[in-house]
Design a protein with these regions (language model features):
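Solvent-exposed alpha-helices and their adjacent loops that cap or buttress functional pockets
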Residues: 31-32, 129-130, 136-139, 157-163, ...
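Glycine/serine-rich anion-binding loops at beta->alpha junctions
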Residues: 86-115, 133, 243-259
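Conserved, helical-rich catalytic subdomain that frames metal- and/or nucleotide-binding sites
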Residues: 140, 145-245, 260-273, 277-288
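ATP-binding N-lobe of GHMP and related small-molecule kinases
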Residues: 1-95, 113-125, 160-161, 171-174
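Short, basic/glycine-rich phosphate-binding loops at helix/coil junctions
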Residues: 45-59, 107, 207-217
């Protein structure tokens, strides 16, 4: 049994305030893309959970988000069943694409089926919130407004890129530690986010994607670009190569851009290879 784990990008991302618990309240628009990892599993009757990757990992199994998701679902449901899990990893980690969170969300969906638990999405999203802020959205995917630390979700009808447009995602060789992104990021208060959300929701489906693509925004660019100029350079290269718009995703370091055709996006991907470790041409994924 297999499950697709689509990555995500942020079409809009603002930092509203720092909370007393040390976390930050955000306002963002999540969008899944038709690119990601694949999680497979086979049933075990002895209750054991094993995890194998297509490439070596250098951290303990107990700290792996896929393993944590499997154990959490097993404990929550009380099932005596286990699973042999295999993860085909394609998306880069720590790239602002939600790769690890997507894998955890896919694991929840997959084992819910394998163990015949019949949990609804809402229950899986609740469990996902215990694993990470992006996991609840990635249980369902598609298009959603998110607030709080990302756990307060308003799903909207999924959108798709207009016409023959394609998305190019590229990840530079530089990595952006989360602390670098949050250090110095401006806290805007709620006004910009609330205004953006209201205008986007008032638009119809076609108008809303046009509005979103014309109003791409990521507050983290202000704090990331000075410390990680390769990310800023990559965004500039996207625009030089003909992207209609471009933006850093999440807290970095990946950048995405929209091109009018698949061929244009593929050509740009070739041009970006010298300054990036990962490139993929894709479209939006409409969710589960």
């Amino acid at each position: 049994m297999k499950e697709f784990a689509p990555a995500k990008i942020n079409l809009f991302l603002d930092v509203i305030r720092k909370r007393e618990d040390g976390y930050h309240d955000l306002g963002t628009v999540f969008q899944t893309v038709d690119a990601g990892d694949t999680v497979s599993a086979e049933l075990r009757a002895d209750g054991r959970i094993t995890l194998c990757y297509n490439e070596p990992q250098d951290y303990p199994l107990e700290s792996d988000l896929v393993f944590k998701a499997a154990k959490l679902l097993q404990q929550e449901s009380g099932t005596t069943l286990g699973a042999d899990i295999y993860l085909k990893k394609i998306m880069p980690l720590g790239a602002g694409l939600g790769g690890g969170s997507a894998d955890a969300a896919a694991t929840l969906r997959l084992l819910n089926q394998l163990w015949k638990l019949k949990y609804k999405n809402e229950k899986l999203e609740e469990l996902g919130a215990r694993l990470g802020a992006d996991v609840p959205f990635l249980v369902r995917g598609g298009t959603a407004f998110a607030e709080g630390i990302g756990e307060k979700l308003t799903f909207v009808k999924s959108v798709q890129l207009p016409g023959e447009a394609h998305l190019l995602i590229a990840t530079p060789h530089d990595a952006v530690p989360t602390k670098d992104a949050y250090a110095g990021v401006p806290k805007s208060g709620p006004d910009r986010w609330e205004s953006y959300k209201a205008k986007c929701l008032r638009a119809g489906k076609t108008a809303s994607i046009d509005f979103a693509l014309k109003n791409l925004f990521n507050a983290f660019e202000v704090s990331v670009f000075p410390k990680h100029p390769l990310v800023e350079e990559m965004k500039a290269e996207f625009l030089r190569l003909g992207a209609k718009c471009a933006l850093m995703s999440g807290s970095g370091a990946s950048v995405f851009g929209i091109f009018e055709t698949r061929e244009q996006a593929k050509q740009a991907a070739e041009e970006l290879k010298p300054i990036s470790r990962y490139q993929i041409v894709t479209r939006f994924f409409e969710g589960f």
